Amino acid sequence: MKVGVLLVTHPGVGSAMLHIASRIIGRTTLPIKCLEVPTDASLEPTMESARSMLEVLNAGDGVLVLTDIYGATPHNLAKEVACNQPGTTVLSGLNLPMLVRVFNYPDDDLDTLSSKAAEGGSRGIMTCPLQSVGG
């Protein structure tokens, strides 16, 4: 069994991240789904979709839920649904380095995968010194 991964994001973010990560790393063996939450979405049907996806993804090893913006509607919805799902971790601040890290460690347990995802996301953010290529 493997940890499931659910991306809960604003429209276009999760699907684009999955597409790009798949192009960089290749297909993942992790069960992974994406729920994109429109700003005008009805909350209860969207929460039911999230619950259903979590149940499908959790084959016993848990689910890592990745959200794009802490405190935004997709994150709040994911957090609310995850509260009633044992073995679920919610991690906010989704970026491409975070998702690539998840793709790179498909056999890790939930706690380890969550830590590696957070580390990958954090290490992928840096200020780059500016200098010309020629010196």
Say what each PLM segment does.
Residues 2-135:
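N-terminal loops that bind phosphate or other acidic moieties
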